[in-house]
UniProtKB/Swiss-Prot annotation:
Organism: Candida glabrata (strain ATCC 2001 / BCRC 20586 / JCM 3761 / NBRC 0622 / NRRL Y-65 / CBS 138)
Catalytic activity: S-ubiquitinyl-[E2 ubiquitin-conjugating enzyme]-L-cysteine + [acceptor protein]-L-lysine = [E2 ubiquitin-conjugating enzyme]-L-cysteine + N(6)-ubiquitinyl-[acceptor protein]-L-lysine
Zinc finger (RING-type): 641-680
Name the record gives this protein: E3 ubiquitin-protein ligase BRE1
One Gene Ontology cellular component: nucleus
An example Gene Ontology biological process: double-strand break repair via homologous recombination
Regions annotated as coiled coil: 127-166, 251-384, 483-609
Length: 693
């Protein structure tokens, strides 16, 4: 935002002379800049959290997509398995898994897996494969736990890195602040060469322990605030002479020069720690890349390693250039932050003005909305009354039309009776029709009167309902206005409570800062020892990482061998599938031949019936009655159903190939007798096939 906005020059702070004692204005400006630095750090943390949230949200969407695909696969498997089930409980379990969605119970999934194993074992799969898969699952869980521990270690290191960089940014902000320099009486001097040379004699090849880097920054703050307290105490004391004041001033100046030299040496150590940390990060990245390449290539060449080492050296050189550019960007960032303060003040004032105008507009709109709602309710009640009246008129017109039609029909019948010769039968029919017509008309009149009464009751109720609705809406509008007033009052009360809490928090923070300054004095003496210990710990970490890399390589080789075994098992399963498909084709061919035989037998039967009907063939048929009876019985056994011996065979079972009639098959399915009566093989409704003989 600050790069796109026009640069606004910040007003220069009016600080007192450094030779004079501190004033109240200096302390207030110092506190304001400290608050600004705190707000800026919180803003940076918020931006980082938003980025993390976006990445986590994308991963969540991917997981939802994969879960949906897995659930679709599970539902298809359950629907296929439902046809093989014989018991009702198993079918209900399959239906639950089909309609489960994303909420699946663990106990029900275990039952479904047991059912799946039951039917897969019946189809010919072996238990050895299941045991091998279970062992592989245990190994995968073991590797998962190891990776989880590594993830914890890496997250701890990342947290320490974040804390370290936050401390660095805070120290840079404090160094560039004019109020900090004024309060702690910092001046740019070049008399610190002796102290810097003493600090350079210390060991520089220390490890990048991030917590110790942060304590250096804290020591700087601690010494500066101690000097401020001592300076204010000395200036406020009344019984001190001018000579003693000068001596104290010289002592403070000497302390400040010592602290500045110590600060410069600490900054150099921090830079060396940063370089060493970045080198370690690059080496870790390179090792991770090598591990990922080992998944595709088992043996790596020495030439590639040498190239990687050259690339690391080039990256080191580019890293030094980037540190210089980073420092220049930090200075620019601080200038832009100062300009941003003034711009934000202007924006806040404009925002308050626009907010007040919008509140006034909102009140006017709320009044208009109440007026529109009242008119709307009145119109709705009128429309309901009109609709009730129109429905009555339509029904009356329909009844009149029905009566007119009946009268026309009656006149036509009378006219026909007058033209035709009179007879007793017709007179009786006419009398019956007349009596029926009278009964019908009386019934219609009764129904019509009942309907009118019902409609009048409904119209009264609708009118009362509209009145009640109007009262309800009026009460709701009054309730909304009361709720708005309550919200405004609660907001004002919350703001007052927040101000009280903020004042209490500031008091607590000042007390905590004083206590932390006393504690940091003791910690500053042990910084050098901690740096040496941290160097040793970092070397041990590097050794552990190398050992872990070798373990990961071994795990990769083991997983590749397991992968090959699984591929072999898959090929065997595909071969079994192909053999089953060939068996199905053979069964279909047999079925087609049986159908052809049935067609030939039908033709033969039709010919025999034709010959039986001829008079010349009666003599010959009497001779061959026994043979024909046998042939007819054989034909019936082939064509008619063997269960009922009434219907034709028109339904075949796919699992075994036996043929029965459709009625018998449906009766057996309805009675839950789902086994073939000839071979006792199980079948379902999906295994039935229509056959046309």
């Amino acid at each position: 935002m600050s790069s796109e906005e026009p640069p606004i020059k910040k007003q220069k702070l009016e600080l007192s002379d450094p030779d004079e004692p501190l004033t109240q204005h200096d302390v207030i400006s110092f506190q304001k800049e400290a608050l600004f630095r705190c707000l800026n750090s919180k803003r940076v943390e918020l931006e980082a959290l938003t980025k993390q949230y976006s990445t986590v949200h994308d991963k969540w969407e991917q997981n939802v997509h994969t879960l949906a695909t897995l659930m679709s696969v599970l539902s298809t498997a359950a629907s296929h398995l439902r046809g093989l089930c014989n018991e009702e409980s198993e079918k209900t379990l399959c239906d639950e898994m089909i309609n489960a969605g994303e909420s699946v119970d663990k106990e029900r999934t275990d039952e479904f897996l047991n059912l799946l194993r039951k039917y897969t074992n019946s189809n010919g799969s072996s238990d050895s494969k299941i045991d091998s898969l279970g062992l592989e699952l245990q190994r995968a869980n073991k590797t998962k736990s190891e990776l989880r521990l590594q993830n914890k270690k890496l997250t701890d290191e990342i947290d320490s890195l974040k804390a370290y960089y936050h401390g660095l940014v805070r120290s840079y902000d404090r160094e560039d602040s004019m109020t900090v320099k004024r309060v702690f009486n910092k001046q740019k001097t070049d008399d610190n060469t002796d102290n810097i040379s003493n600090t350079e004699q210390r060991p520089t090849s220390v490890s990048p322990v991030l917590t110790n880097g942060a304590t250096h920054v804290k020591n700087e703050v601690k010494t500066e605030q101690e000097a401020l307290n001592n300076h204010t105490d000395s200036s406020q004391s009344s019984g001190i002479t001018e000579e003693e004041k000068k001596k104290l001033f010289l002592q403070y100046e000497n302390k400040i020069t010592d602290l500045e030299s110590h600060n410069s040496s600490l900054n150099r150590i921090i830079e060396e720690l940063e370089n060493y940390k970045q080198l370690n990060e690059k080496e870790l990245a390179q090792t991770r890349l090598e591990i990922s390449n080992l998944l595709s290539e088992k043996h790596s060449n020495e030439e590639e390693r040498e190239d990687l080492l050259h690339q690391i050296e080039k990256l080191k050189a580019s890293n030094t250039d980037l540190t210089l550019t980073n420092e220049s960007f930090l200075s620019k960032f601080q200038e832009l932050a100062k300009e941003k303060d003034t711009f934000q003040e202007k924006i806040s004032s404009d925002f308050e003005k626009t907010l007040e105008s919008l509140k006034a507009q909102n009140l006017a709109l709320e009044k208009d909305l109440v007026r529109v709602r009242t008119t709307r309710d009145e119109l709705i009640s009128k429309v309901a009354i009109l609709e009730a009246e129109t429905s009555k008129s339509v029904l009356i017109s329909d009844l009149k039309q029905a009566l007119d039609i009946l009268r026309d029909q009656w006149e036509k019948i009378e006219f026909r009776n007058n033209q035709s010769p009179s007879s007793d039968a017709l007179l009786k029919e006419i009398q019956d029709l007349e009596s029926a017509f009278k009964e019908l008309s009386s019934l219609t009149h009764k129904k019509y009167s009942e309907y009118l009464n019902h409609e009048s009751v409904i119209s009264k109720l609708t009118i009362e309902k509209t009145k009640a609705d109007q009262k309800y809406f009026a009460s709701m509008r009054s309730k909304d206005s009361i709720l708005v007033e309550n919200k405004n009052l609660s907001k004002s009360l919350n703001k007052a409570n927040e101000l009280i809490l903020q004042l209490k928090d500031t008091d607590k923070l000042y007390k905590q800062k004083i206590e932390s300054l006393h504690k940091q004095l003791a910690l500053s003496q042990n910084n050098e020892k901690r740096l040496v210990d941290s160097n040793k710990a970092a070397n041990l970490k590097v050794m552990n990482l190398n050992s872990e890399i070798q373990k990961q390589k071994k795990l990769l080789d083991f997983t590749s061998s397991q992968k090959n075994e699984l591929i072999n098992e898959l090929t065997e399963a595909n071969g079994m599938l192909k053999s089953k498909e060939l068996e199905i084709e053979f069964k279909e061919n047999e079925l087609q031949t049986a159908l052809k035989k049935n067609e030939k037998l039908e033709e033969f039967l039709s010919k025999e019936n034709y010959n039986m009907n001829k008079p010349s063939s009666l003599a010959t048929t009497n001779l061959d009655e026994d043979s024909m009876a046998e042939e007819l019985e054989n034909f019936r056994t082939l064509v008619y159903c063997s269960l009922c011996s009434k219907n034709w065979k028109n339904m075949a079972i796919r699992t075994c190939g036996h043929v029965f009639c459709e009625d018998c098959c449906k009766e057996r399915l309805a009675a839950r007798m789902r086994k073939c009566p000839t071979c006792n093989k199980p079948f379902s409704s999906n295994d039935l096939l229509m056959v046309h003989l």
